Amino acid sequence: GRFVAIVGPSGSGKSTLLHLIGGLDTATEGSIKVDGSDIMKFSENEMSEFHRKKIGFVFQKFNLLPMLNVRENIVLPLTLGGDPVDNEYIDELIQFLGLKQREKHLPGELSGGQQQRVSIGRALATKAEVLLADEPTGNLDQNTSYEIMEYFRNLNKKYGKTIIMITHDMNLAQNADDIIQIVDGRIV
């Protein structure tokens, strides 16, 4: 697993590329290979399985359900998918993300950084191999942004997760193993 940052000006195609990799958008030509499989050829069921098992998404907006506590928000993809919850893994994930003391708190009782860590936990609850992060620090202050980068680095190094992150902040991008720059829809 690698930690890759994709950078470029607004409107350059960064988020579009991430959405194509994650199968949220469909390309008009070519192929998109993730983990050796051409996702452009997936049936609807295969794409659904791909989203549930292989890919975790972290967005700029936390998208947490306000009536669910930290743990319930993290296990939500498993609950919705009818998948069993590996409580030992979820406990380890909550501990790793520094949320053990906040496990029973609702999103409104958490700081922005804590909410983003919950969304990272939710993205990883299914044991996804690839984490796609679209401006994950866009709503956070600089110190909290660097804390989130530290979690990403640790996820990559300790757990071997592949992380593809969109950012406009070159300082944050420097935390990645590789930096890809996009200008006008082209990798430069």
Task: Please place each PLM-identified region on the residue numbering.
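ABC family nucleotide-binding domain
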Residues: 1-175, 179-181
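Conserved switch/coupling elements of ABC/ABC-like ATPase nucleotide-binding domains
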Residues: 184-188
